[in-house]
Amino acid sequence: MSANEFYSSGQQGQYNQQNNQERTGAPNNGQYGADNGNPNGERGLFSTIVGGSAGAYAGSKVSNNHSKLSGVLGAIGGAFLANKISDERKEHKQQEQYGNSNFGGAPQGGHNNHHRQDNNNNNGGFGGPGGPGGQGFGRQGPQGFGGPGPQEFGGPGGQGFGGPNPQEFGGPGGQGFGGPNPQEFGGQGRQGFNGGSRW
C-alpha cells in the first residue's frame, strides 16, 4: 500500500508493541494491512532499477573513454526517465477508470471532470449558445472553442475547468468549457488568450 493510498483510505493502523515480543500465529486484526495484490511500490522500484541500469549502459556506450561519470549520469537520467514513464502510465490508467465522466447542458455548458489529463477522446461537454466572451487564460496552442468532436462550440456559464492538455481555468464572463485535445476557451468572436503571457 502506498503512502497516498494509506492516508486517503482513512485506515491508519495502530502500532501495539508488547515488550518487544513478536506475536506469531496470531491473527493480524487489520493493524498492519499488507496489500499483496497491488505491488505498486515494487513496480516503481523495479522501473527505477531497470531505467538506471539501462541509462548507465547507454551513458558508458556514448562516452568514448568509458568514464564512470558518464555511466553515473546515464544511470541518474535513466532512473529519472523510467520514473516519469511510470508516472505517466499510472495517470493514463487512472484516467481510463474515469474516462467518460463528462456532464453537459445549458446553462453551464459542458463540464469535464478531468483536470489537466490527456485521454484523447473527444467527449467534451455540449455547450449552449455562445457566451459573451471574457478572458480565458491558457498556455500555448491554437485558439478554438470547446465542445464535442470537430464541432468545437463553446457554451455560456461561469468559471470552470477545461479538459486535458494546455487548457487552464476559465476567466470571468460566459466562457464555454473545452473538451480534450488542444482546444482552448473562448466566448463570442474567439476571445481568449493563448499566448505565452501570464497574468
From Swiss-Prot:
Q: Where in the cell is it found?
A: Mitochondrion
In-chain residues carrying the UniProt-annotated modification Phosphoserine: S53, S70
The alphabetized UniProt keywords are:
Acetylation, Mitochondrion, Phosphoprotein
Please give the residue positions where the record annotates the modification N-acetylserine: S2
Stretches the record annotates as Disordered: 1-48, 89-199
- The main location is mitochondrion
Its domain of life? Eukaryota
Concerning InterPro entries, the annotation shows: Gly_zipper_2TM_dom
Keyword Protease part of the UniProt annotation: no
Q: Where is the composition biased (Low complexity)?
A: 7-21
Q: Where are the transmembrane segments?
A: none
Regions of biased composition (Polar residues) lie at: 22-31
Q: Does the keyword Cell cycle apply?
A: no
Q: Which Pfam families match?
A: Rick_17kDa_Anti (PF05433)
Bias regions of kind Gly residues — which residues?
Answer: 124-163, 170-179, 186-199
The protein's matches in PANTHER family, at most eight in alphabetical order, are given as:
EXPRESSION LETHALITY PROTEIN HEL10, PUTATIVE (AFU_ORTHOLOGUE AFUA_1G06580)-RELATED, RICH PROTEIN MS8, PUTATIVE (AFU_ORTHOLOGUE AFUA_7G05650)-RELATED
Protein name per its UniProtKB record: Uncharacterized protein YNL208W
Query: What taxonomic classification does the UniProt entry list for its organism?
Result: Eukaryota, Fungi, Dikarya, Ascomycota, Saccharomycotina
